[in-house]
């Protein structure tokens, strides 16, 4: 931010406020018709002064708007930190979600994702690179299908594989779905399962179970409580990051969260 411009903007706002205060004091000392006449005169004079100042310094309108936006962003950031703290246990220790990377890492990255989300796919390789290069990040995946029926089917399939075959098989399926751009039809899912030596029938049965849908619904409920409406959304340490983040930016967040 340009602090000289900010100072000028705040000075303008201060002067305007001072004018209003002085005029209020002056009019308060008069009574009856004289006061009403003074108020009309003072109001007209004030309006003229403000108009003249703005015409001479039109940039202050944009600068003031920028200050408001910055304050709103700072307030949103504070709210996001509070949300992460409030729902920390659900984010970190729900007892179901896949935990990878370095499970004993000194910092945790949680990703809410949808297999049909283009930006999730874009982030996929960069998240994998981050985990590999850093080596000390605990990674949690929250299945968060929000882009229609195909998204739900893909998440059901991945969760069912995890429930039956464990975390390693889940990660293989997850990686495949993140790079798959077609429709998750039954034929496609059979092919994916058999590629990894998995029997499709039990997986399809598990997909329809209440356990799988409960997990998806609980992730959605958590997202709603945390005001998450899009994917990808990351919780990196105590930082809530809404939307795609490039690799270099994620590395910077890791440094900030570690205090280095």
Predicted regions and their residues:
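Extracytoplasmic thiol/disulfide redox context detector
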Residues: 3-149, 205-208, 213-230, 259-260
């Amino acid at each position: 931010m340009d602090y000289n411009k900010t100072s000028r903007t705040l000075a303008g706002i201060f002067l305007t406020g001072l004018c209003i205060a002085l005029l209020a004091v002056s009019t308060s000392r008069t009574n009856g018709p004289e006061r009403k006449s003074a108020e009309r005169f003072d109001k007209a004079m004030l309006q003229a002064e403000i108009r003249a100042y703005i015409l001479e310094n039109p940039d202050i309108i944009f600068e003031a708007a920028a200050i408001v936006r910055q304050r709103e962003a700072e307030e949103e950031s504070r709210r996001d930190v509070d949300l992460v703290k409030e729902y920390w246990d659900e984010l970190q220790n729900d007892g179901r979600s896949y935990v990878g990377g370095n499970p004993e890492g000194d910092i945790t990255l949680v990703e809410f994702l949808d297999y049909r989300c283009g930006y999730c796919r874009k982030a996929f390789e960069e998240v994998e690179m981050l985990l590999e290069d850093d080596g000390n990040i605990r990674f949690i995946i929250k299945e968060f299908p929000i882009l229609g029926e195909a998204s739900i089917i893909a998440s059901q399939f991945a969760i069912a594989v995890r429930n039956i075959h464990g975390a390693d098989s889940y990660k293989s399926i997850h990686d495949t779905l993140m790079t798959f751009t077609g429709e998750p039809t039954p034929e496609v899912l059979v092919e994916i399962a058999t590629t990894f030596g998995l029997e499709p029938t039990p997986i399809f049965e598990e997909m329809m179970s209440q356990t799988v849908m409960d997990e998806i619904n609980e992730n959605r409920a958590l997202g709603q409580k945390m005001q998450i409406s899009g994917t990808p959304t990351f919780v990196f340490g105590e930082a809530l990051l809404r939307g795609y983040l490039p690799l270099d930016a994620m590395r910077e967040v890791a440094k900030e969260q570690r205090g280095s």
